[in-house]
Amino acid sequence: DNLGGNLRIIVSAAAPIDAKVGKWVEDIGIKFLQGYGLTETAPIAALTPEYEPSRYASTGMAVKDTDIKLKNVNDAGEGEILIKGPTVMLGYYEDEEATNEVMEDGYFCSGDIGRIDSDGFIYITGRSKNVIVTQNGKNIYPEEIELMLGKIPEISECMVYGKKESEDAHDKELILSLIHI
């Protein structure tokens, strides 16, 4: 009632949100849904079904007539998210080269890394362009570290990124964190 009594649903999109936020929204009596999409998917590709119990860390399931699959899946079950459906773009205007870089057999290669559970719910875990590759070849996504740091009560904001010591391909990649307390 403090919000006017008519607000039934809040939809979040753009980036994974802390599960505590979704739970809080539902605790005050408002259904919390998450969506996933990009400009190239006009704009939604996945959404939490309203009738499903919330899975706060998930961006939902593929919307009607849309197929979402993973490419180059690693041992953790994560891979690049590919999207195909009637709302996926035909291509970038007058830029066939850029179009060919992101389209594969009718699927749009999002650049987002995620996993899909056995029920079809999608979980975004990072961006392929953000990946930090350690000396032993392990892939680390800054977003995962940010989520862990965000659970520390004394940290109000943080940002994690990778930076090479120099342009030499053999140099180490450093993991840097900016933390606001």
Model-derived features: where do they sit?
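Conserved ATP/PPi-binding loop(s) of AMP-dependent carboxylate-activating enzymes
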Residues: 62-63, 74-101, 138-140
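Conserved beta-loop-beta connector loops within the AMP-binding
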Residues: 67-84, 102, 115-119, 167-170
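Short coil-to-beta-strand transition motifs
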Residues: 60-65, 108
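Conserved ANL (AMP-binding/adenylate-forming) active-site segment centered on the GW(Y/F)…HTG consensus within
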Residues: 53, 88-111, 146
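AMP-binding/adenylate-forming catalytic core of the ANL superfamily
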Residues: 85, 90-91, 113-179
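Gly/Ser/Thr-rich phosphate-binding loop
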Residues: 1-54
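Thr-Gly-centered strand-to-loop micro-motif
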Residues: 12-13, 34, 70-71, 83-84, ...
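Short polar/acidic secondary-structure junctions
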Residues: 37-38, 50, 73-75, 165-167
